Amino acid sequence: MFNEKKAKELVLTSLVTDSYCLGTHWVYDETQLKNAPVDFNTLNEPMAMWHKNKSAGDFTHYGDQTLWLYEYITENEKFDAKDFLDFWALKIQSYYGYVDGACRNTLENIKNEVTPSGSSSTDLSIIGRIAPLLLVSQNEQEFIKNVEDFVCLTHNSQLAKNASKFFAKVIIDRFKGLSVIDALEKNKETSDSQIQGFVNQGIESKGKVTFDVIRDFGPACDISGGFAGLVHLLAKYDNLKDMLIENAKAGGDSSARAMIASIIFMIDKPISQIPNSWLNIKAKIG
């Protein structure tokens, strides 16, 4: 169902997006953001201490873990949740980047033989890592199942499951030819009231300034703030570069918002929408 070339382009898009966001990722202070020593037209080294070992072209821990999933899938030509969890656990235990609460709690559960081992995290970022699953999903039902199985490995909360299923279905409908707004509206109708509220807030905010909107919704990691923020990005912009620049200027968990938004946005767009200099990431997809 999913064109392999386009699926790989979406993996690349999500990684480029994460690397681009690295510069202001997890910067929350408004004064710092408005005076950020970064060039928003290119990739930048990180401002935040959490990424102190990183440089321009590197990824946040979101991009690194997306790359792990891509590596696993290209090596195995399938997604097996239990097998991937073992693969992921080996990777994360020797990882030099930031290890967030969801990962730490999941590792602790694995160590203590707690099943299911996924944390109760409601962080948005896990959803932005799902693009590689398109490569091994033969139909929409398998994609939805693969997404849920993947998300639950580290983010086993009902909100994370609900939000990831919503965006998986939006991706499917975008592949079927629906516009961004039509796909969001269609899947809103079959979602719970919380997700309906997030979608409505995001779409209704499209005429407002992105910096202000994201600060108002909440720029941090949780789905409760980031969901509406990424819908705002999708509703407001018809150009990938503009969308990612304005999102990065708002700081906070910029990568979590943008990775999902860029995947959905680029399904019917040429890869040429990504500026050439942004492709200088430290990974090869192909």
List the predicted regions and their residue ranges.
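Structured, active/binding-site neighborhoods that engage oxygen-rich ligands
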Residues: 1-286
